[in-house]
Amino acid sequence: MSIEDLDTVLKIESASFPRPWTRRHFLDEMEHPGSFPTVAATGDGEVAGYLCLKQVLDEAEILDVAVDPTFRGSGIGRALVDWAIAFCRVRKLRLLCLEVRVGNHEAISLYRHLGFAEVGRRKNYYENGDDAILMDLSIAQVEECDAV
């Protein structure tokens, strides 16, 4: 992710979440040495989605991931999560974690398909009272992927 990507990333973020991250939040992630924000682009360089990953010791956490509504269902989300998994494999991390809103059925289905398991919930985590589902993926159990 670069400064040039931010306007598009912010549009996708606003279209995807009721409480979107701010420009400052993305800039902080871009400047933090343990954070690895990335974008997925179309063949003509248009940003179609993004993922923000943070590494802490031998674990990584997906902090934010979203796909432009016009590109949803095209495999961009999966490609971004595959990138995160490959990142963990290359760095020999043991665990990839995330949290997802209980009502985000498409994302939950994708994560389960990729091997993530529910490990807990944060009750009433979101402003509207929705729970957050905590999910983990053991990197040692993941088959090789070449997304990096």
Where would I find each of the regions flagged by the language model?
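Acetyl-CoA-dependent GNAT
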Residues: 3-72, 81-91, 120, 138-148
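Conserved hydrophobic beta-strand within the GNAT/NAT acetyltransferase core sheet
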Residues: 62, 96-100
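Short glycine/proline-centered loop/turn elements that form peptide/ligand docking sites
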Residues: 77, 81, 104-107, 124-129
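Well-formed, non-transmembrane alpha-helical positions, independent of function
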Residues: 8, 109-110
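Conserved catalytic-core motifs of GNAT/GCN5-like acyltransferases
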Residues: 99, 112, 117-133
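Short amphipathic helical patch at the helix-1/turn junction of helix-turn-helix
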Residues: 67, 101-102
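Short hydrophobic clusters on alpha-helical segments that form packing/core surfaces
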Residues: 84-88, 96, 107
